[in-house]
């Protein structure tokens, strides 16, 4: 989901200590958790977490985990419709604004402001309606990805999703480095905490007293450091794993990759704005998605920025479709339903 991006952006409000938690948490907690869950599933024939709980903890625990898993997976799937629909709506309005010819494609900020003010419509639809349309499209995709075999949809489009994710990660690193070296508009790494002493590296920079570093930092940045949701997805990957030797790269390595993405966006949060209060103001004005959009457009231009934002969009989409799919499999296994044909 958007956790490895939105979480680190919010976590940046606590200062550079957020990056320390991402590194330590990812290596010693998140990746270990994912590898452990994945290997449990691999060595039990791709069994789901409820089945594993039943095997090792008994039938009552299995029944409880079944209900809990289905409820939480459905909630996750629903939640991961809103954020990609919002970003896709913004992209659509801005692209149509540039295509209309009335606004220069090089002036991404002007396009965005006009679209937000309602000065741009898409086939007569304002931005709110466009977001609703994208919500419907994403839901339809989720249904198809849930019902059809993995190789029919998920297996075919995920390579493109992966390419967008790679472009987003490399592009934002390039943007940070090039901005740091720029003479026209320099943006130094961690400029919001530049010149601090070593002791202050562990200081809580969050100004609101009701948001202490412990334990809220660890709740703010979960995906990218440690995510229990990954345990529900392990069986999907375990059933596609041909050899146990692949497990370390698939389960442990994937979490390390997620941690790198989290570090990139935490660095954006610490660097893009002049100060942490400015970052907080941007988040209040439009949620972390505003930070994602504004920084991507600034570093990579309208076209490159849109591709970077699409790299962000694929994260909640790939979590939403697999969440619904995992819920379907849990229900089918619980009721011993045959899953060999589409009708079933």
Language model feature labels by segment:
Residues 65-72, 92-149, 165-168, 339-344:
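Transmembrane alpha-helical segments of multi-pass small-molecule transport proteins
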